[in-house]
Amino acid sequence: MKDRKIPLSLGKTCPVKCSFCYEKDHSYRTTFDVPLTTQEDWEFILKEIQSHPTGAESWVVGGNEYMEWTDLFLHPRAMDWLKEFLETTDKNIILFTVGYTPADEINQLADKYPGRINFELSVITLGAYRKRLMPHAPTVDQVMRILDGPAVTSANFYSLGPDTMSVDAKKISQINKKCLLWMGCLTPLKYIDSETTALMRQGKKFLARESRKIYEADLPNTTMIQTESDITAFLNRNKIIKTFDSCELEKKDTVVMAGNVYKVMNLLRRNRARYLYVPNHMLGGDSNCSTLLTFGDVGRRLTNQRRVYLPKVILEGASGEEKDISGASFEEFQSQFPRCTFKVLHKVNSDLSNKKLYEKGYLKNYVEDYLGNPLHKKFEAITLPN
């Protein structure tokens, strides 16, 4: 709770069973069997929340630092407790759900407490693929009724093929012209089934086409593309180059990086240092992001290096501790390689990736500065080492 995450629990695994869910595999990290949150538990949680000073930051329902995205609005008391939170505190709250909030209730709360609810609605898709991906999710009608009101701050949905993301964007914008449209592709990881993986990859092939259609539609909503690490890296290439230049690395220095940053550096700073490309082996699939690298991933790529520079973002997998997303500690990792000295690039951190790198994540930037820039073809042509 020190990170303002409200620890509710369904007391069981999420029953929604979305085929794309990143919670299908827990082997890479420690999990906790937390019982169903009771009224007594909630009273304790609420008192703890009330004891914290109110700041600009929001409290969160619907996820934790271990990437658990169980839909907590399936808890039978979730809406009652949300109301009590809003009534008895002056704090703001962020909600994550695929649409299990009663439409009238959540929109009435947004009217009653303007500016205090940041509702991030996971639409995923409104089209023909919805039943395959989300067999137990709320109906399209339920999702649209939630959207038809002031509650939803942002709606995320994805390209799954021709006339998917673009059609959804127009549908949502017709009934809600204010919510942010958060788009892109779903990323297949190694434990996602083959049929869903193929659908995700089909979506990526059509992302450019779908994005251009939305760009040409000139919707009143803010539109963003935020799931594609390669695109994000390319759009922020100047910031990435500037950050690495400021680290004052020598040409002989070995620097760990995921594929997206590796491609930027090889395109624009080929001989700045020795770039050690590290695949996201732990998560596998098409994952290609420094934030999701683990120490195990790095260890697999080390040979006889004596000094290696690590981006700090790898060490920020757990709040306030030097651990990766799997829970492995930096100290433990270092002990496995006694002949190698590890240095941390403190400027390459989660603050950079979560804030600065998202500044150019608008769909307009993708269409104009990525698709419209001939340099992106050279970027895409760069091959990653085996």
Task: Please give the residue ranges for each predicted region.
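Well-ordered, non-membrane alpha-helical segments in soluble/globular domains
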Residues: T37-K47, L74-K83, H136-I146, T164-I172, ...
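Radical SAM enzyme core and accessory elements
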Residues: T222-N386
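Local cysteine-cluster metal-coordination motifs and their immediate loop/turn environment
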Residues: S9-H26, G284-C289, P311-G317
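Core AdoMet radical
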Residues: K5, D25-I45, I49-A103, P114-V143, ...
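Structural alpha-beta junctions
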Residues: L86-I93, G115, L147-S154, S173-L181, ...
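Conserved C-terminal portion of the radical SAM core fold
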Residues: E57-W59, I117-N118, P138-M224
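Immediate flanking context of iron-sulfur cluster ligation sites
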Residues: K2-L10
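Short, well-ordered alpha-helical microsegments
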Residues: P102-I106, K263-N266
